[in-house]
């Protein structure tokens, strides 16, 4: 049976992650309160950020920037701003 969490991003009950994907206290918070769907949406944004800003995950400052963007996106309701990106209209 799938594990459910109250997703802070979606603001509703949803299927939770299968295991902790991120280390430390933040990883535990993500595991406890972010759904698979929300994590998938974050991964898309993360990929765009890494590519557009040419982030290098070997660089501690770049990792810190990406982590802050992740917290803003998943827990504070702030969308990721990517220069020149216009989301498709439905």
Curated annotation (Swiss-Prot):
It comes from the Bacteria. One of its GO terms (cellular component) is cytosol. GO terms for molecular function: iron ion binding. InterPro entries: Fe_traffick_prot_YggX (IPR007457), Fe_traffick_prot_YggX_sf (IPR036766). Could be a mediator in iron transactions between iron acquisition and iron-requiring processes, such as synthesis and/or repair of Fe-S clusters in biosynthetic enzymes. PANTHER family: FE(2+)-TRAFFICKING PROTEIN-RELATED. Belongs to the Fe(2+)-trafficking protein family. This is Probable Fe(2+)-trafficking protein.
């Amino acid at each position: 049976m799938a594990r459910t969490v109250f997703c802070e991003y979606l603001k509703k009950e949803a299927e939770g992650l299968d295991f902790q994907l991120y280390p430390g206290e933040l990883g535990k918070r993500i595991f406890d309160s972010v759904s698979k769907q929300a994590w998938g949406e974050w991964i898309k944004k993360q990929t765009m950020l890494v590519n557009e800003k040419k982030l290098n995950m070997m660089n501690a400052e770049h990792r810190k920037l990406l982590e802050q963007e992740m917290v803003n996106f998943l827990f504070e309701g702030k969308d990721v701003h990517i220069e020149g990106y216009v989301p498709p209209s439905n």
